[in-house]
Amino acid sequence: MWQSVGLTVLVIVATLICVLLFMLFGWYVVWQLFLSKFKFLRELVGDTGSPQAETEPSESESERSSPPTPRQRPKTARQRVIPPDSTT
């Protein structure tokens, strides 16, 4: 009687451990292949030491080193909005 109960408990515990390990391994693989590419998710997890985070240049460095793209190109005098002088 007690042997069958013990064996049943052992099977249930072993099954739960196997399922938990399988889920953790799956999350690790998904993180490495897909989720770690998103900066927002890395910030949520607090992952600042990843190689990808270190190799990505900051915005100020990339703006200085790269030529201006059409979005970053300075506006011409006609396109600029000049604020009215408050001294007059």
Curated annotation (Swiss-Prot):
Naming one, the record's GO cellular component terms include: membrane
Would you tell me the protein name for this molecule?
A: Small integral membrane protein 13
Transmembrane segment boundaries: 10-30
Principal location class:
membrane
Please indicate if the UniProt record lists Glycoprotein as a keyword. Answer: no
Q: Does the keyword Transmembrane apply?
A: yes
Q: Where is this region: Disordered?
A: 48-88
Where does the protein end up? Membrane
What keywords is this UniProt entry annotated with? Answer: Membrane, Transmembrane, Transmembrane helix
Q: Which organism is it from?
A: Danio rerio (Zebrafish)
Question: Out of the domains of life, which is the source?
Answer: Eukaryota
Belongs to which family?
Belongs to the SMIM13 family.
The membrane-topology field of this record reads: Single-pass membrane protein
